[in-house]
Amino acid sequence: MASAVWGNAPWWSPPPPAPARPLTDIDFCSGAQLQELTQLIQELGVQESWNDGPKPGPDLLQAKDFVFSLLSLIHRRDPRFPPQTELLLLRGGIREGSLDLGPAPLGPYTRGPHYDAGFTLLVPVFSLDGTGQELQLDMRSCYAWLCLPEQVRGTSVREAWQDCLGPPVPGGRDWIHPTDSREGPRDPQSSVDQPHSDIIEPEAHESLEKSPSNVSVPESPQQNLTDIGFPSLSEETNDDVTKAADVSPGPQPSEAREAWPTLCPAQVAAWFFASLAAVAESLFPVPGAPRLVHAARHAGFTTILLATPGPPRRLLLFDLIPVVSVAGWPQGARSHSWAGPLASESSSFYLVPGGGGQTERPGASGWQLCFARQELALKARIPTPLLQAHAAAQALLRPLVAGTRAAAPYLLRTLLYWACERLPALYLARPENAGACCLGLLDELGRVLEARTLPHYFLSGQKLRAGDGASSLLGALALLRGDPARALRAAVEEAKAARKGGGLAGVGAGSH
């Protein structure tokens, strides 16, 4: 009897196997299905969307206004603080990679156990034109020095900042100046720029001359925070922060520029915290307004925690960092990206109190270059699936770096920019590739931790440092990489808890 056939095979043979699924559907390292990872990443994005929408909720707006009111009170107390200034508000705290401060002690705060959402606020206390002699950039590092002459426009700047002066610029270095500044010198008391924000564009730039509407100050500010249920404000001491000290009178104006004293970032950070603490101690709670429950200084910035009235009650973290705003663009800095030109007629950058991320720290008077404004513009051009992948990788990394000096969160953010330079935009924009992109970012971060350096995205030839904790973090990252699906499920549950608000441990009990 003739045998029937199934295709080219006898009828008794098993059917041919189904076409193999692409190898990219399975993660080789962990065996996880990329489709499942992508679904978890998308779910994580939905759960975290309460603080990521185009129209922030009233709790976030109230907290923002509360912080702006605090700053206006600082100006009333100390005229050195500019009455009008641009405030750049970034979503995510410094511990989540919003800024590069290098490996620095950032405190024990962890999103979830200690707060629901974090933000970074850049507060310019000084503004200058980068073409002047005051700014000195080191060609061999990411640092700069701000040298103060005796007078600027008839104002004794050096006398005004006497308690924040540092030694002259160290010798033996090659210096460059920013270029392409289209503006004249700007007085730090009269700088008013266009609004920029990562939360709500039209309202992020506020005049600090406005009367605060949700902060009350008693006529006799004798009340201490402890007396009204707030923990005392604390100041961490570490090797990266120096206390304000008596400074000898500066050189005469006729002396060479090399002898000019510098504006010390650590001293400025100490002054900023002391001013905020003095204002905070004079406050008393206002019904229906956010409540300041904690403030402390870490490295070069101040961290405050605000409890919103709710419902739901949320605890919001704000990292307030005093910065110098510089008009112009540094020579040798990247001028183009995958998204187009970076340097334009209105280009500017910031100087921030660095955490000592270089192998050889240039001294306590060195400010670190920061391109937060350009990073904000780049973020708007990154495909949404890649942003979701980065947010997921960031959530997985969060518990691993809590309480450490690791610079991994900002390294992960920089890898995001390099990925856009390297990979096709069509690939990054496909939603089904979010899982693969998340794993790719984690794998790249592992290689960076092993090498301990990563090329700086904006400054050619410069390196970002991973810090001393890179080895231990690399081991923890390898364990996480073995089961990314489980870690993502835990991150989703954490995001659900944060969405509900409240139930946060260790806040308001003086434990920070």
From Swiss-Prot:
Chief place where the protein resides: membrane
Membrane-side (Cytoplasmic) residue stretches: 285-512
Disulfide partners: none
Membrane topology: Single-pass membrane protein
Basic and acidic residues bias spans: 174-186, 195-209
UniProt keyword terms in alphabetical order: Apoptosis, Cell membrane, Membrane, Transmembrane, Transmembrane helix
Extracellular face of the membrane: 1-267
Region Disordered: start-end pairs: 168-258
InterPro entries: MAB21L/cGLR
Function: Selectively involved in CSF2 deprivation-induced apoptosis via a mitochondria-dependent pathway.
Protein name: Transmembrane protein 102
UniProt gene name: TMEM102
